[in-house]
Amino acid sequence: MTEKTSLSYKDAGVDIDAGNALVDRIKGVVKKTRRPEVMGGLGGFGALCALPQKYREPVLVSGTDGVGTKLRLAMDLQRHDTIGIDLVAMCVNDLVVQGAEPLFFLDYYATGKLDVDTASSVISGIAEGCLQSGCALVGGETAEMPGMYHGEDYDVAGFCVGVVEKSEIIDGTKVTDGDVLIALGSSGPHSNGYSLVRKILEVSGCDPQTTQLAGKPLADHLLAPTRIYVKSVLELIDKVDVHAIAHLTGGGFWENIPRVLPENTQAVIDESSWQWPEVFNWLQTAGNVSRHEMYRTFNCGVGMIIALPEAEVENALALLNANGEKAWKIGVIKASDAEQRVVIA
């Protein structure tokens, strides 16, 4: 009689010991993100977080996002240290445009075979993003799923919850004719348009690691972490009458700005007010991409656009630039019933 082989979970492709090693590796960086409202530590079935006491009528704001196919480029180039920052940025920037202070963040990391070094690098980046935005990394899920992903490929998703005073929610309803639009400079393509980026790299035959652009490898431009605007914008909201904020993500200028405009208003963008960073000029030229498509796919150097009264512009620019942002007047709001909500001229 043939003796049956005793199988283990590891034989099936799931290494519990590797998962435990990862938890031990990241405990220190996660602890640095802790906020006073967080109750308990890592390892519970759920994370507990109290609401900050300063809010009279707190409203919770939630968001979830990923980093799209920027992740594929990062895996191809074996550069995992900033993807976590991208993940946090995509979530917390969406929250702050509504006036919300990010409270806590959770991540989901899924892979076919867990590489502790890679996962630790990614999660350390997530912790860094949480530090930059002032939110606590309270938990997450690391899923090793053999057969679901090729080799050591992985995917990440983020989930964030923030809080805003009910009377201070920013929803665009205050936007009016004559408001001025202020731009906040981006750090690069952020985390959008990377399927087109990768297609341009493929068609052009360009090696981003050896191609030099503005004194550094193209890969550095393409993988620059998404800028986190939370602390600068929260201070701005506290001191200036902000009417609306648009986070320029997928859909670029054409789709994101109208999301915060009331009916019968139009955003007029002054294209001469800034110069595209070199990476966008390279992408347009290498891919023969139309101007319209560039503004539809990429942020073209603008990470956020803020609408506020003209009387607030000087103070707003001074505050933002003092906090390390590259801020400038990029346009105005005009009364219009035109179907085209955004004009770039």
Curated annotation (Swiss-Prot):
UniProt cross-references to InterPro entries, sorted A to Z: PurM-like_C_dom, PurM-like_C_sf, PurM-like_N, PurM-like_N_sf, PurM_cligase
GO annotations of cellular component type: cytosol
Biological process terms in GO annotation: 'de novo' IMP biosynthetic process; adenine biosynthetic process
Alphabetized UniProt keyword annotations: ATP-binding, Cytoplasm, Ligase, Nucleotide-binding, Purine biosynthesis
Highest taxon listed in the record's lineage: Bacteria
EC numbers: 6.3.3.1
A GO molecular function held by the record: phosphoribosylformylglycinamidine cyclo-ligase activity
Localization of this protein: Cytoplasm
Pfam annotation, one family: AIRS
Broad enzyme group: ligase
SUPFAM superfamilies: PurM C-terminal domain-like, PurM N-terminal domain-like
Metabolic or biological pathway: Purine metabolism; IMP biosynthesis via de novo pathway; 5-amino-1-(5-phospho-D-ribosyl)imidazole from N(2)-formyl-N(1)-(5-phospho-D-ribosyl)glycinamide: step 2/2
Catalytic activity: 2-formamido-N(1)-(5-O-phospho-beta-D-ribosyl)acetamidine + ATP = 5-amino-1-(5-phospho-beta-D-ribosyl)imidazole + ADP + phosphate + H(+)
Cross-referenced PANTHER family: TRIFUNCTIONAL PURINE BIOSYNTHETIC PROTEIN ADENOSINE-3, TRIFUNCTIONAL PURINE BIOSYNTHETIC PROTEIN ADENOSINE-3-RELATED
Family affiliation: Belongs to the AIR synthase family.
The name this protein goes by in its record: Phosphoribosylformylglycinamidine cyclo-ligase
Organism the protein comes from: Escherichia fergusonii (strain ATCC 35469 / DSM 13698 / CCUG 18766 / IAM 14443 / JCM 21226 / LMG 7866 / NBRC 102419 / NCTC 12128 / CDC 0568-73)
Annotated gene: purM
